[in-house]
Amino acid sequence: DPKIGGVMIMGDRGTGKSTTIRALADLLPEIPVVANDPFNSDPSDPDLMSDEVRQKSGTGAEIPIEFKKVQMVDLPLGATEDRVCGTIDIEKALSEGVKAFEPGLLAKANRGILYVDEVNLLDDHLVDVLLDSAASGWNTVEREGISIRHPARFVLVGSGNPEEGELRPQLLDRFGMHAEIHTVKEPALRVQIVEQRSEFDQNPPTFLEKYNPEQTALQKKIVEAQKLLPEVKLDYDLRVKISEVCSELDVDGLRGDIVTNRAAKALTAYEGRTEVTVDDIRRVITLCLRHRLRKDPLESIDSGYKVEKVFARIFGVELLEDDSSQKNGAGQIKTGVR
């Protein structure tokens, strides 16, 4: 569900964050777009059309359609504002009287994924641009009295190492979900990862071919889940309890409630069911809320564990506590509900 609002992955160096995110591009399905349109306009949804396509659609003219893979666009840390937003060719505009617009990365990312590696090191002026586009879904470029706007609805995906700096709360709140990656401690699993990496380095095409059936099956499962999503139901009592958890944790705004509802439904659809259970909510609520809690420098427990503790009390389930769960927010909850 793109409306969840993307995901932020923070964790130790060398844990495969960037590799995992870039691998998502192969799982993404094809979508219908207007042919030769730089903004990947949707042929049927006016909110996802550029002004030019909308005008053409309004006159009843035939709009050519093609199918393209969902785009994954990398936003480099050193990118300029013009490269991100796009530029207007003033000289051409003055001499020929036409709006000559060179689309930027936001145009390319419309209806796709915008990925920012080391997002916590991103310049403040680029953060402001991202916040503006993520909030409105449109990108506006104004130069010398000429104004151009186009849709910029993208799923924001970021990764970074928390040791290298904190992220601004305004941008952090724009990520629907927040995952923490920790280095694998189990020796057998570490050996398996190293062996698979060596196998890939020796012969990449053979390695990819070996896992292609699993990849295809996963892609098919995601497409089927998208079709099933509108039929998924979340009981009113469960929605009330989700909001109770958010209220108890003093989460600012209502974005936490909305994202948790959407994420629980998306997980249910992914597993081929139409009724959300308590266990579905348990599996997503920490990801949806841990980054929305107010930071308390005197707090000794992890924010993820705090979410789990409040969830267990309000939903009436048993939380199995241990030392490691308090340390990294990976506590287990025994629900007895499926």
UniProtKB/Swiss-Prot annotation:
Which Gene3D superfamilies does the UniProt entry name for this protein? Magnesium chelatase subunit I, C-Terminal domain (1.10.8.80), P-loop containing nucleotide triphosphate hydrolases (3.40.50.300)
Please state the Enzyme Commission number of this protein.
Answer: 6.6.1.1
Catalytic activity as recorded in UniProt: protoporphyrin IX + Mg(2+) + ATP + H2O = Mg-protoporphyrin IX + ADP + phosphate + 3 H(+)
UniProt key word Ion transport: no
What biological processes does GO assign it?
chlorophyll biosynthetic process; photosynthesis
Q: Which UniProt keywords apply?
A: ATP-binding, Chlorophyll biosynthesis, Ligase, Nucleotide-binding, Photosynthesis
The UniProt annotation places ATP binding at G11, D12, R13, G14, T15, G16, K17, S18
**Family annotation (SUPFAM superfamilies):** P-loop containing nucleoside triphosphate hydrolases
Return the InterPro entries for the record. AAA+_ATPase, CHLI-like, ChlI/MoxR_AAA_lid, Mg_chelatase_ATPase-isu, Mg_chelatse_chII-like_cat_dom, P-loop_NTPase
What does the record give as its pathway?
A: Porphyrin-containing compound metabolism; chlorophyll biosynthesis
Q: What is a single molecular function from GO for this protein?
A: magnesium chelatase activity
**Which Pfam families does the record associate with it?**
AAA_lid_2 (PF17863), Mg_chelatase (PF01078)
* Purpose of the protein: Involved in chlorophyll biosynthesis; introduces a magnesium ion into protoporphyrin IX to yield Mg-protoporphyrin IX.
For this chain, the family text in UniProt reads: Belongs to the Mg-chelatase subunits D/I family.
| Protein name per UniProt | Magnesium-chelatase subunit ChlI
Q: Which organism is it from?
A: Anabaena variabilis
Q: Taxonomy-wise, where does this protein's organism fall, top ranks first? A: Bacteria, Bacillati, Cyanobacteriota, Cyanophyceae, Nostocales
Q: Which gene encodes it?
A: chlI
